[in-house]
C-alpha cells in the first residue's frame, strides 16, 4: 500500500501501432530491398532505416522514395536505396495526411454494430488457422501456437486477462481445424496471397483496387474459413456466454506477415458484418485477425486486439509530432512489448467490470492507494480546477510479475493522467 499526500496538482503525466518492423520487398528486376514497415490496421507505410518513405510506382512496379504532391503521396524519380534521399532534397517521414487517416478510420468503423464481448466469466475464443492456395501447410506444431493463447503459467492471453481482471475473466482459446497438437492443420483458401494484396498493374494485377473490394475479399475469406470448421465446434461449447446471439469472439491466425502499403493482411479487430455466418445458432461477428510471422504473433498483439473486443479503443496518436504521447508504455492500448503491461486503471473502469467505482478526492489530505495489481482501492479521481470536462486519474504502478515488470522506467510510483470527457 502507498500513502500519498495531495496538496495541489498542476502537471499532467504523460502503440498497438507497429513500428520499424523489418520487411523485404522484391523489385521487378528481382532485387531484394530490406525496408521497415510501420502503421496500424487503418494505414501502413514502408520506409528505410532513416525514415524516408518508400512507395511502389503504379506505372512500372518499382519501389521509389516518396514525396508529397498536394495531398497525395507519389513516387519520386529515385528508386529506393539508389541515392542518398537527404542529398536529393527528399523529406523524411512522409505519410498520409491526418484528415485522410481519420477518414480511413471512420470508414472502417462505419458499418459496424457497436457490441463488446463480456468482461466477466468464461469466454471460449475460437481460433482458426488460414493459409492461401499458393502456400504449404503450417510447419510449426499446434502446441507452439497454443502457448501465446493458453499457456497456463503465462505469458499468454489467457493468463494475462486472468491477472488484469483479478480472476474475473477467463479466455480459453480452442483451435480449428482440429488436429493432433504435435502437427498442424489449416483452412486453405481458393485464392493465392496476392489476391489479398493491393492492386498494381505490373506486379499484382489480381489485387484489390479499393477499400470496398478489400472488405469483401477479407470477409469472404473469413466466412469460408468459418463455414469450413463450423461442424467441428461442439454444440455444448458455450461460445455466447452472455446470450446476446453472437459468438463472443473469434480469432484468425493467417500465415505469413504484412508485406507493404495498405495491406489488409495486418493484425486488427473488425466485424464480419458483410455476411450472416452462424455457429450453433450464434452469429459470428467480432473477430481479431493475426499474422503468424515477422514478429506480429506475440502475446502483446493478442492481448491488444482482444481488449478491442471488450470495447477498448486505441490510445496512440497517429501523428507523434502534434500531440504528447497519450500514455505510452503504461497501457497495452498505446504501446507494449511482446509481453504486455497492464492496461491503465481508467481503461479497466471505463471498458470492463473489473473496477466498478472511481472515488473522488475532493480535499487535501493523506490517502492510501494499492498497486493496480490489487483488486481494491486502486484508483482515484481528482476534478480539474479549470475545466468541467476534464479530470485526473491517479493510480499506483509497481514493477512486478510477468506483465507489470514491463512498464517504463526502473521504479514504482504514482501515475497521474488527464481524462478529457
Q: Model segments located where?
A:
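Sec-dependent N-terminal signal peptides
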Residues: 2-13
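Short, solvent-exposed loop/turn elements at domain surfaces
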Residues: 33-34, 43-47, 74-75, 134-141, ...
